[in-house]
Design a protein with these regions (language model features):
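A conserved hydrophobic secondary-structure block that centers on an alpha-helix together
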Residues: 1-48
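Short, conserved, GDST-rich strand-edge loop motifs in beta-rich repeat architectures
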Residues: 1-7, 55, 72-89, 93-95, ...
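Short, solvent-exposed loop/turn segments at conserved positions within beta-propeller repeat blades
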Residues: 2-7, 45-46, 99-100, 155-160, ...
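Beta-propeller blade signature
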Residues: 3-17, 52-58, 107, 164-169, ...
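A short beta-strand motif characteristic of beta-propeller blades
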Residues: 19-23, 73-78, 117, 173-178
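Blade-terminus and WD-like Trp-Asp/Gly-His loop motifs, strongest in beta-propeller folds
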Residues: 31-39, 44, 88-96, 140-147, ...
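Surface-exposed loop and turn segments in beta-propeller and other repeat-based domains
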Residues: 58-83, 119-141, 181-182, 222-236
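Serine-hydrolase catalytic core recognition
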Residues: 188-278
Length: 278
């Protein structure tokens, strides 16, 4: 196990008289402040948990120990602590801290009093779909208590990308907006209109689209036009059983004019994971 990471000691320093209070000594975590400054929070890779420090009480709370789903990369294969799955953010007035597990999103009480709640209702785990919050307003530091947030998704089985929406103040399945055999960027929203620009990519090319709802989209660019002059390629997901009995999967690339009656040279490439890039 790699133990060479730098440890940090964090203090809260008064802007009035310069006095300081110890938050945590010799922690492997990275410290950040909540939007209102009521809490300092961090993730500790050795315990695989999130902690908060109250600027009012000075008390440290483990706010994720009641979450029984992994909050970190379960496929980590290097001799170091796995990376955290990340956070969605904070709700208004620092009321709740939204934490990601591998698939779903949890509402945690930064004071450590209320039990964490899976606001995506376990939908992600049940459907092998990862969710990540799309921050449409870069100036906004918190999520409204009853806000309907946009989530970017990837299905780990089909490899489809897409978008869902989710009301923050309810425990319910996210609502599907769009999904398909593409990879999507995080959309950019117009300041004063319900209009979005998003990049959609596949083996056929990558283009920019405009949409009012991210479901019905109009193509803006023709960046991949030059490909028509070339014999391009296709890709498909293949699965097989390895020598140890475990199932594995990968990508099979073929020329666009592939003829199954012909023989072709084959190149095998393997390094970590590539199939999610279908």
């Amino acid at each position: 196990q790699w133990e060479g990471r730098t440890k940090t000691t964090a203090y809260a320093i008064s802007t009035v008289d310069g006095s300081r209070r110890l938050i945590k000594a010799n922690s492997p975590g990275n410290f950040s402040a909540s939007p209102k400054g009521r809490f300092v929070f961090w993730y500790e890779p050795d315990t695989k948990n999130y902690f908060t420090w109250s600027s009012i009480s000075g008390v440290i709370k483990n706010v994720s120990d009641k979450i029984k789903e992994p909050l970190y990369d379960v496929e980590n294969d290097v001799p170091d602590y796995p990376r955290p799955a990340g956070i969605t953010g904070w709700t208004e007035n620092d009321q709740y801290f939204l934490i990601n597990d591998v698939y779903d999103i949890w509402q945690a009480d930064p004071n450590g009093v209320e039990q964490p709640k899976n606001i995506t209702n376990g939908f992600g785990k049940k459907n092998k779909t990862e969710f990540n919050y799309v921050r449409l307003d870069r100036e906004k530091r918190f999520i409204g208590a009853d806000e309907n947030i946009l989530l970017r998704s990837q299905n780990k089985t089909s490899k489809f990308g897409g978008f869902y929406t989710k009301k923050v103040n309810s425990i319910a399945d996210p609502v599907l907006v769009a999904e398909g055999p593409y990879s999507y960027s995080s959309p950019v929203k117009a300041d004063k209109a319900e209009q979005y620009i998003v990049q959609r990519s596949s083996i056929a090319g990558s283009e920019l689209f405009v949409s009012a709802n991210l479901k019905d989209i109009d193509q803006l660019t023709d960046i991949s036009a030059q490909q028509k002059d070339f014999n391009w390629l296709t890709v498909e997901l293949v699965k097989w059983k390895m020598l140890d009995g475990k199932m594995s999967e990968g990508l099979l690339f073929k020329p666009e004019n592939f003829d199954p009656k012909k023989k072709y040279p084959v190149i095998f490439y393997f390094y970590e994971k590539n199939s999610d890039g279908l």
